[in-house]
Curated annotation (Swiss-Prot):
One of its GO terms (cellular component) is cytosol. One of its GO terms (molecular function) is tRNA (guanine(37)-N1)-methyltransferase activity. It comes from Rickettsia peacockii (strain Rustic). GO terms for biological process: tRNA N1-guanine methylation. It catalyses: guanosine(37) in tRNA + S-adenosyl-L-methionine = N(1)-methylguanosine(37) in tRNA + S-adenosyl-L-homocysteine + H(+). Keywords: Cytoplasm, Methyltransferase, S-adenosyl-L-methionine, Transferase, tRNA processing. This is tRNA (guanine-N(1)-)-methyltransferase. Transmembrane segments: none annotated.
Length: 234
C-alpha cells in the first residue's frame, strides 16, 4: 500500500509539521502512514538577500512571488516527488470539501505551494498546471495554514489512522454515510443530567430503531437550519 507523501514549498519551513506532528496525524506520521518533506523557497532566492518577490506589473498593492524563483523551487520539488499533483491554496480556487479530499487521495503524491504577499505570478500556475484550492471565502496571510488543514483532513481518511474506520460513516458531509452528506446530529455523554439539562430520553431507551430515527431527524433539522444547501441532494 502506497503512503501519502506531501512536499511543501514555503518560506516558513518551521511551520511544518506543526499540528500535524500531534494527535492522530502525528501518530500516523510515526507509523509511516504518511510522510512529508519541506522545501524553503527562500533557498532559491536571488542575490545575496535571497529575494523571492517583486512589484506587480500594471501597478497595485503588495508584492508578487517571482516565477523564476518559484520555478526553481518547484523543479526541485518535482525531482523529489515525481508525478505529484500540485496544489496552490488560494481564495480563487475550488472550494475544499470532504468529497474533494477523497478525490485528491487518488494520487498519493502531492505538492503544496504556499503563497505569501499578494500571491504568485500567474505564469507559474500555467507552466506547472497548478490546481488552485480554497478553504473558504476569507483571506489568510499565506498558504501554510490551509495546507495544514487540507493535510489533516486527508490524513484521517487514510486506512489505519482512525482506531475505528467506521467512524467516518457517521460524520458530517459523508455522502455515503449515515447522514447522507448532511450535518452530524447532536452528541451527548455522561453525566445524564448536567445543570438541569437532561440527555434526550430516546438515547437512553436502548431501542436502536428509535435512536437511529432520532439521529436522522436531528441531522436533517440541523442541516436545514444551518446549511440548507446541503439538502439539495438528500
Amino acid at each position: 500500500m502506497s503512503i501519502l507523501h506531501a512536499t511543501i514549498l514555503t518560506v516558513f519551513p518551521e511551520m511544518f509539521p506543526g499540528t500535524l506532528g500531534h494527535s492522530l496525524a502525528g501518530q500516523a506520521l510515526n507509523k509511516n502512514i504518511w510522510s512529508y518533506d519541506v522545501i524553503n523557497i527562500r533557498d532559491f532566492g536571488l542575490t545575496k538577500h535571497k529575494n523571492i518577490d517583486d512589484e506587480a506589473y500594471g501597478g497595485g498593492n503588495g508584492l508578487i512571488m517571482r516565477p523564476d524563483v518559484l520555478g526553481s523551487s518547484i523543479d526541485h520539488a518535482l525531482a523529489l516527488n515525481p508525478n505529484a499533483e500540485m496544489y496552490y491554496p488560494s481564495p480563487r480556487g475550488r472550494v475544499f470539501t470532504q468529497s474533494f479530499a477523497k478525490e485528491m487521495l487518488k494520487n498519493k503524491n502531492l505538492i503544496f505551494l504556499c503563497g505569501r504577499y499578494e500571491g504568485i505570478d500567474e505564469r507559474v500556475i500555467e507552466e506547472y498546471n497548478v490546481k488552485e484550492i480554497s478553504v473558504g471565502d476569507y483571506i489568510l496571510s499565506g498558504g501554510e495554514m490551509p495546507t495544514l488543514t487540507i493535510l489533516d483532513c486527508l490524513i484521517r481518511l487514510l486506512p489505519g489512522v482512525l482506531m475505528n474506520q467506521n467512524t467516518l460513516s457517521s460524520e458530517s458531509f459523508e455522502e455515503d454515510g449515515e447522514f447522507k452528506g448532511g450535518l452530524e446530529c447532536s452528541l451527548y455523554t455522561r453525566p445524564e443530567i448536567w445543570r438541569d439539562r437532561a440527555v434526550p430520553s430516546v438515547l437512553l431507551s436502548g431501542n436502536h430503531r428509535l435512536i437511529n430515527e432520532w439521529k436522522k431527524e436531528q441531522s436533517h433539522m440541523i442541516t436545514k437550519l444551518r446549511r440548507p444547501e446541503l439538502l439539495k441532494d438528500l
